[in-house]
Design a protein with these regions (language model features):
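N-terminal core-binding DNA-recognition domain of tyrosine site-specific recombinases/integrases
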Residues: 1-55, 101, 185-192, 210-212
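Short, charged phosphate-coordinating catalytic segments
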Residues: 58-64, 112-134, 232
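Short, basic (Lys/Arg/His-rich) helix/loop patches that form interaction surfaces
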Residues: 96, 152, 168-172, 194-236
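Short, polar N-cap/turn motifs at the start of nucleic acid-interacting alpha helices
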Residues: 129-134, 208, 229-248
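C-terminal catalytic core of Y-nucleophile DNA break-rejoin enzymes
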Residues: 144-164, 172-199
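Basic, Lys/Arg- and aromatic-enriched nucleic-acid-binding interface segment
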Residues: 44, 59, 63, 70-119, ...
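Catalytic-site neighborhood detector that most strongly recognizes the C-terminal catalytic loop/helix
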Residues: 85, 141-143, 238-263
Length: 268
């Protein structure tokens, strides 16, 4: 789909298969990686698909050489997972802005920040997945990254905002974020979160490019650890496979010396 959109956006869109050459692919990959501000991994995923397509064209005689040859993947060792934490002052600005401009997008931000639910998983949440009495949110295995059901604790701010937005007045089988971020029967991809963040939040609040919608998840984990919530609780809420993953988020400025080791004494 992005390839079709990119081609349509060109001053002279390609029409014939011979125009699908290495120069065109290079420019498309740069568009995905640089202009759309995607990760190196996303860039590699697109290139991998293009390699398969190029192989198909060669196999069936549409071209006389594999046009992706010479375009390399970015090595995994060169891909560093960037975790950008949004500052407290910017979190306040974000909250104040969305309270007046778009409470439903603020709700999506709260779910990402407090429940650590990935954007794609958020897009599949239905009204009936919330258990207000128990204070939990159910994520179904069909849509989670590890393909397991998950029951997460809901922060009171999420419930209060859902009531304020009238979310619980909709049928339980409605998606929480359908067209226009309003509950509805139609599934909408997580792209609408990224688009709103890029075109409205980042633009109007003048956030740096390093601030992405997904940054709220990393910021939420770090904020909980900074608030001295124990690592086990944070690990379970974030669904980390190991406490070692959670420890990566621990801010260095709150790490404290172990008093037992400080006072440890021997004959040496």
């Amino acid at each position: 789909r992005n390839l079709v959109r990119y081609t349509a956006s060109l001053k002279v869109p390609i029409t014939y298969i011979y125009q699908f050459n290495r120069e065109y692919i290079n420019e498309f990959i740069e568009h995905i990686y640089i202009e759309r501000e995607n990760s190196a991994q996303t860039r590699n995923n697109y290139l991998s698909w293009l390699r398969i397509f190029a192989g198909y064209l060669l196999k069936h005689g549409y071209v006389d050489k594999k046009v992706t040859d010479g375009i390399d993947l970015i090595p995994k060792r060169s891909i560093k997972k960037q975790r950008t934490v949004i500052s407290e002052s910017d979190l306040i600005r974000l909250q104040e802005y969305l309270k007046t401009k778009n409470k439903r997008f603020l709700l999506a931000c709260y779910i990402l920040f407090y429940c650590f639910v990935r954007p794609k998983e958020i897009s599949y949440i239905r009204i009936g997945d919330f258990n207000v009495k128990a204070g939990t949110l159910l994520l179904h295995s069909d849509y989670t990254k590890n393909h397991k059901d998950a029951v997460l604790t809901i922060n009171r701010k999420i419930i209060e905002l859902m009531i304020d937005c009238g979310s619980f007045s909709y049928p339980s089988d409605y998606y929480l974020f359908s067209d226009g971020l309003t509950p509805g029967p139609k599934w909408r991809s997580e792209k609408q979160f990224r688009d709103y963040w890029t075109h409205y939040v980042r633009k109007n609040l003048r956030f740096p490019v390093s601030y992405k919608f997904y940054s709220l998840k990393d910021t939420g984990v770090t904020s909980m650890l900074r608030a001295r919530i124990d690592n086990i609780s944070v690990r379970d809420q974030a669904r980390h496979s190991s406490i070692l993953i959670t420890d990566i988020y621990t801010p260095h400025d709150i790490e404290q010396a172990n008093p037992i080791i400080q006072k440890f004494d021997t004959v040496f």
